[in-house]
């Protein structure tokens, strides 16, 4: 009887872990977007004056800002109202990275928090 070595199963599982933990995000502007994968979290930004919505995915640190207490692995979303020019939603899960109209984005960010 042939048994598959346990350490080999563990090694395979560890190499697959980043793929399992990665998420898919929409990337693009307004309604011209594509789904891309292998991100740590998604970001969606709305320019307040032009109402343009930019979708992106990001990798790396799960704290959106340096020395930020909000860790996206603990809290699923973070909404930033930057200098009254842009409203940005950062999410570990794809909660606010959905292709929507400007008004729907506003309503979604209120519901996300």
Curated annotation (Swiss-Prot):
Keywords for the protein's UniProt record, in alphabetical order: Glycoprotein, Secreted, Signal
Glycosylation sites noted in the Swiss-Prot or TrEMBL record: 47
Main location: secreted
Cleavable signal peptide: 1-22
Compartment list: Secreted
Record bears the keyword Signal: yes
GO cellular component: extracellular region
Protein name: Uncharacterized protein EGAP4.1
Species of provenance: Caenorhabditis elegans
């Amino acid at each position: 009887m042939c048994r598959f070595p346990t350490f080999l199963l563990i090694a395979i599982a560890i190499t697959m872990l980043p793929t399992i933990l990665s998420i898919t995000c929409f990337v693009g502007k307004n309604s011209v977007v594509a789904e891309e994968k292998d991100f740590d979290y998604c970001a969606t930004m709305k320019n307040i004056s032009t109402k343009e919505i930019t979708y992106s995915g990001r990798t790396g640190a799960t704290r959106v800002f340096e020395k930020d207490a909000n860790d996206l692995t603990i809290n699923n979303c973070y909404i930033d109202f930057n200098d009254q020019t842009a409203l940005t939603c950062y999410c570990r899960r794809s909660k606010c990275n959905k292709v929507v109209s400007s008004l729907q984005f506003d309503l979604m960010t209120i519901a996300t928090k």
